[in-house]
């Protein structure tokens, strides 16, 4: 018989991980406070998502947000949770949320040096049918000495200090990067803590899955149509790619990270600038995918190189395994050359 205990006595929790990263960077502790506050909000949202049906949180709150999406009751709750937790961390100065038309400026007595862009509940159109949804965030340093304003959030993704997403699925998971790879943490409901389950996850060089909304095939540009045709009917006799699309970006991106392949929300005739928002949807997931060895592009440039012009700016997004994204870009270049 073994005398090994069934309980882990030296587990790496996300709280401990964040503190260790801060110590290694010889930081002030402000980013540690910020990340821990974000994690508290994520735990609270996870709890609300699990209780939503019983607590009458499904359904529409009776309004439309700034980007034209119907606002769900859980959206409103999640947004308030994140804003309140971040402002009470004393580490933020500007908050940009999908749910707020303008940036939220933290009160002077609570201000810190960080800017946070977030989508409190991504994929909320899937709430009522219990499909996976998530929270996405990116953290930047304020780069000027001026009074905090919306302009402080208009930084390219290359300036990100830390980014991540939470996925509320069969379990609650957080993918987090502070610029040194991507680590995955799962919420242990017994402990109420996120525990490290995978360190330095790497995306496959090439996958076997493509993910996009083929319902919009009527509006696809020539490059997208050509690429999808190649995946479904390979000319080299290889097996076709599998098609997977949840319609909740966090779920689709996380599957792409874990299994490899490509996720696409390209520009089309209906949405010539793309549909996903740069600051709080595209940049955080592009950062995670690049940190894991993948690629993320708008079709014309890396997502993280885009210089934002407005806080709710939309861009096309194609990300995933480097060889798959490169093949898509080859289709784009070929079609541009043929014009």
Curated annotation (Swiss-Prot):
Signal peptide coordinates: none
Function as written in the Swiss-Prot or TrEMBL entry: Catalyzes the hydrolysis of fructose 1,6-bisphosphate to fructose 6-phosphate in the presence of divalent cations and probably participates in glycogen synthesis from carbohydrate precursors, such as lactate.
Motif Nuclear localization signal: positions: 204-208
Record's subunit section: Homotetramer. Interacts with ALDOA; the interaction blocks inhibition by physiological concentrations of AMP and reduces inhibition by Ca(2+). Interacts with alpha-actinin and F-actin.
Regulation of protein activity: Subject to complex allosteric regulation. The enzyme can assume an active R-state, or an inactive T-state. Intermediate conformations may exist. AMP acts as an allosteric inhibitor. Fructose 2,6-bisphosphate acts as a competitive inhibitor. Strongly inhibited by Ca(2+).
Positions bound to AMP: 18, 28-32, 113-114, 141
GO CC annotations, alphabetized: anchoring junction; cytoplasm; cytosol; nucleus; Z disc
The UniProt record lists the keyword Metal-binding: yes
Catalytic activity: beta-D-fructose 1,6-bisphosphate + H2O = beta-D-fructose 6-phosphate + phosphate
Cofactor mode of binding and number, as noted: Binds 3 Mg(2+) ions per subunit.
Region named Important for interaction with ALDOA: 3-10
UniProt binding sites for Mg(2+) 1: 69, 98
Cofactor(s) required, per the database record: Mg(2+)
EC class: hydrolase
Name listed for the protein in its UniProt record: Fructose-1,6-bisphosphatase isozyme 2
Chain positions of site Important for the conversion from active R-state to inactive T-state in the presence of AMP: 33
Positions contributing to Mg(2+) 2 binding: 98, 119, 121
Record-listed Phosphotyrosine modification sites: 216, 219
Binding-site list for substrate: 122, 213-216, 245-249, 265, 275
Main location as per UniProt: other
Annotated family: Belongs to the FBPase class 1 family.
Lineage: Eukaryota, Metazoa, Chordata, Craniata, Vertebrata
EC numbers: 3.1.3.11
Pathway: Carbohydrate biosynthesis; gluconeogenesis
């Amino acid at each position: 018989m073994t005398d090994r205990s069934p309980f882990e006595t030296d587990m790496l929790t996300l709280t401990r991980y964040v503190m260790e990263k801060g110590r290694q960077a010889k930081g002030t502790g402000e980013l540690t406070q910020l990340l821990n506050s974000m994690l508290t909000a994520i735990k609270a949202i996870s709890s609300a998502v699990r209780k939503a049906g019983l607590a009458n949180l499904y359904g529409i709150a009776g309004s439309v947000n700034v980007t034209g999406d119907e606002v769900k009751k859980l959206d409103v709750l999640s947004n308030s949770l994140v804003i309140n937790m971040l402002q009470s961390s004393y580490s933020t100065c500007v908050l940009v949320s999908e749910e707020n038309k303008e940036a939220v400026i933290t009160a002077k007595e609570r201000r810190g040096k960080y800017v946070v862009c977030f989508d409190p509940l991504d994929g909320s159109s899937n709430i009522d049918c219990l499909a996976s949804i998530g929270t996405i965030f990116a953290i930047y340093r304020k780069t000027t000495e001026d009074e905090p304003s919306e302009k402080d959030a208009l930084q390219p993704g290359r300036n990100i200090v830390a980014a991540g997403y939470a996925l509320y699925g069969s379990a609650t998971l957080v993918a987090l990067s502070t610029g040194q790879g991507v680590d995955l943490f799962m919420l242990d409901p017994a402990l109420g803590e996120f525990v490290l389950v995978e360190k330095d996850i790497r995306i496959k060089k090439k996958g076997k899955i493509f993910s996009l909304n083929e319902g919009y095939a009527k509006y696809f540009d020539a490059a997208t149509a050509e690429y999808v045709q190649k995946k479904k009917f390979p000319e080299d006799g290889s097996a076709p790619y599998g098609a997977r699309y949840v319609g909740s970006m966090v779920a689709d991106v996380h599957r792409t990270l874990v299994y490899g392949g490509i996720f696409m929300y390209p520009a089309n005739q209906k949405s010539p600038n793309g549909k996903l928002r740069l600051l709080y949807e595209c940049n955080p997931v592009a950062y995670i995918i690049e940190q894991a060895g993948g690629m993320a592009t708008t079709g014309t440039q890396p997502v993280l190189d885009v210089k934002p012009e407005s806080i709710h700016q939309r861009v096309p997004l194609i990300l995933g395994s480097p060889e798959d994204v490169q093949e898509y870009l080859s289709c784009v270049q070929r079609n541009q050359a043929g014009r």
